[in-house]
Amino acid sequence: MDRLFLDANVLFSAAYRSSAGLLRFWNLKNVILCSSHYALEEARINLSDDAQRGRLARLARKIQLFESTARQMPAGISLPEKDRPILLAAMDARTTHLITGDLRHFGPYFGKTIEGILIVTPSQYLKTHQPR
């Protein structure tokens, strides 16, 4: 069973409109959805209206939330300060995948495994995993 850590941009995009393609993550079988309060709050503050925030709150009820501990970044990994809590929380949640659309900061790590976590875009994961 895959444990998927959803980055803030995935949460934001899923909540942005009621027909968002990323809602497919909530219909996948044999997965556990994970994220962090940090990512959830980042998504929430970037959503512009109450309907979007309401969708985000409903989606969040089906996600296990984790926080990063004060551990160090893995050797050789360079991320901006604001993105470090995402990877660290994914590590603490013992996820199998970090799902992110952040090409700028996580792009160099796409397709690579860090501390047992495969970094992929939403489309990369969904290509090989079908909803129920």
Give each language-model segment a name:
Residues 65-103, 107-109:
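Active-site neighborhoods of divalent-metal-dependent phosphate/nucleic-acid chemistry enzymes
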Residues 13-15, 46, 109, 128-129:
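Residues that scaffold the ATP/ADP-binding catalytic core of kinase and kinase-like folds
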